[in-house]
UniProtKB/Swiss-Prot annotation:
Enzyme nomenclature, EC number: 6.3.2.6
SUPFAM superfamilies, alphabetized: SAICAR synthase-like (SSF56104)
Family statement: Belongs to the SAICAR synthetase family.
GO cellular component terms, A-Z: cytoplasm
Annotated catalysed reactions: 5-amino-1-(5-phospho-D-ribosyl)imidazole-4-carboxylate + L-aspartate + ATP = (2S)-2-[5-amino-1-(5-phospho-beta-D-ribosyl)imidazole-4-carboxamido]succinate + ADP + phosphate + 2 H(+)
Biological source species: Geobacter metallireducens (strain ATCC 53774 / DSM 7210 / GS-15)
Record gene name: purC
Protein name: Phosphoribosylaminoimidazole-succinocarboxamide synthase
Length: 296
């Protein structure tokens, strides 16, 4: 039975942030991150949720974090509710499968995007300038083409309801120093290349994705989520055909539907038909099953 959690309300716990998708509680020594079933598009949160979406995102993140531990440590302390502090246990039914107990890291002030294929805003940028985020690319590429090498295109972290802004690597160096910026870029590309190969063997193309990092006890760690359908473009390998947009296992399906409406992409969001909610949920669940071999 699909489970829908649009918002958490744990009176005994200290809520410190409610993002587009995640509710974050401060437990003193650690944070509790609960991934709800909220979904946003064009930086607007929809009124309807996608049942079990929070479960899918949490399980996919945990899967990837485990795969990358030798490249970079991550923020997870546990994803098992039984390991969480005593004050969380009464909320176990809402937490099961969709929550993480994590280390309190100091987040870096940039989102780290890596692109292996030309799509989305990257394709628009390339058509206009022949570059993506100032990185010159060969002439004659078509939409959804694979890039010869993945490119690193960081952005600022926007406040809720506003858009991220692409920045140059030089600007990132100014924000965090040359050594740290270089390490973040190298780690981002290394993670992407490994994930690309793992996903490829399971019939999924990861066209692009974004990571967030933090500093914990003086060490660089990966935080937030990791290569989920919310933070990545996942395409089915068996129908990949450069020269246009690709079908996907992510919220591109929802975005495409919204593009057909007479909506100005600002709140309030239009109502979503039950069929769009159902199909979006199926795409998320298929990504989990393909990657991990397990659904719910």
């Amino acid at each position: 039975m699909a489970n829908l959690v649009l918002k958490t309300d744990f009176p005994d716990l200290k809520l410190v942030a409610r993002g587009k998708v995640r509710d974050i509680y401060d437990l003193g020594e650690a944070l509790l991150i609960v991934t709800t079933d909220r979904i946003s598009a064009f930086d607007v949160i929809m009124n309807e949720g996608i049942p079990d979406k929070g479960y899918v995102l949490t399980q996919i993140s945990a899967f990837w974090f485990r795969q990358m531990e030798d490249i970079i440590p991550n923020h997870i302390i546990s994803t098992e509710v039984k390991d969480f502090p005593a004050e969380c246990q009464k909320y176990a039914a809402d937490l099961e499968g969709r929550s993480m107990l994590v280390k309190k890291a100091n987040p870096l002030p940039a989102e780290c995007i890596v692109r292996g294929y030309i799509s989305g805003s990257g394709w628009k940028d390339y058509k206009a300038t022949g570059s993506i985020c100032g990185i010159k690319l060969p002439a004659g590429l078509v939409e959804s083409d694979k890039l010869e090498e993945p490119i690193f295109t960081p952005s600022t972290k926007a406040e809720l309801g506003t858009h991220d802004e692409n920045i140059s690597f030089d600007r990132m160096v100014e924000m965090m120093g040359k050594e740290l910026a270089g390490k973040v870029r190298d780690v981002t590309i290394a993670i992407y290349k490994r994930a690309r190969d793992i996903a490829d063997a399971k019939g999924i193309i990861i066209a692009d994705t974004k990571f967030e990092y933090g500093i914990y006890n003086g060490e660089l760690i990966i935080i937030d989520e990791c290569m989920t359908p919310d933070s990545s473009r996942f395409w089915p390998k068996d129908s990949y055909k450069p020269g246009g947009a690709q079908p996907s296992f992510d919220k591109q399906f929802l975005r495409d539907y919204l593009e057909t409406l007479d909506w100005n992409k600002t709140a309030p969001a239009p109502p979503l038909p039950a069929e769009i909610v159902k199909k979006t949920g199926e795409k998320y669940m298929e990504a989990l099953v393909r990657l991990t071999g397990k659904g719910k």
